[in-house]
């Protein structure tokens, strides 16, 4: 049954909303070229906040001569980190509530967080190997707590969300220290979407009050496929953005529906999709030639067409199953996302539209996760256990 614990439901939805905000804000930081505005991690030029006063700026410039302070950008990156840290605390609270009835799993979560927490100052002290080992052990403990959990309630998903959030912190660190490596930046975007999807699932599972409806149950598998296809398309979108290939086909009428005025321009798929290019290269601005970037842009378009057709079919099936409002919302989101994507190309990637395009992908993910939740109905064992049941659960 859905939990009657209002504070828990409120916590779940606040965490979900903050995850969506972080996706949007992270896109803003990346697209405004502020991703490397704080060259160290988790501090910013060695400070908890960022240098503002002239003396502090001069000291920071001396310490990082290759990355002079740009105060109009540093605040964006560091406030993004603060928001991410806040989300981490909210997800930790969810995971602790989820595991409170089981001493073993609760202990695993606490041990994992302690190890990861110790790893951060170790990393700052340049003990990179020790920090990496501690983080890896912590992640393994969280994954064990999630995947070795018998049953499929919201509780294990809450723990899995915590594991993803902790790995997201590592990706955020590597984004800076590995100089915007495309596979890391793209992985960071996917991790953010995964976090949002998991938190949305948790929020729905502890809130939904619809009984199981056999009319919509058959949509579950189709919705799962829809989520997978959308995740693949989000990867292509992140790969396009992180390789600075959004405008590879030009700007204006010659950029869409054709590319550089051609239906099949010169493309280098091999170079465009080399996922790992080593460490030490500064990827800001992109390093690929025009043919490789064009290949990335065109594959993103092909993927968009395939996802659009499938998700529109899924919306039609949802409408036939009685979920008319949900079907209309999904179809409208698809049309909006396509319009935003075309506008990005034709108008030359305006910041507001580019950020909205990322937000549109997140809203599509939310719509699909909501559909998944509605196909399952009320979860019989998802609510908060009573105090009298906790001792028995703790023995498991």
Predicted regions located by residue number:
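A juxtamembrane structural motif centered on a specific transmembrane helix
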Residues: 204-218, 222, 367-396
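Hydrophobic cores of alpha-helical transmembrane segments in multi-pass inner/ER membrane proteins
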Residues: 87-93, 133-145, 192-206, 306-312, ...
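Transmembrane alpha-helices
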Residues: 97-153
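N-terminal signal-anchor transmembrane alpha helix
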Residues: 10-37, 228-240
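Extracytosolic (periplasmic/ER-lumenal) interhelical loops and adjacent juxtamembrane/interface segments
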Residues: 31-78, 246-293
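Interfacial helix-loop-helix junctions of multi-pass membrane proteins
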Residues: 28-40, 127-133, 169-189, 240-254, ...
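Membrane-interface helix-loop-helix junctions at transmembrane boundaries of multi-pass membrane enzymes
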Residues: 101-109, 146-159, 315-330
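Membrane-interface helix-loop-helix junctions at boundaries between adjacent transmembrane segments
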Residues: 151-157, 171-194, 198-199, 205, ...
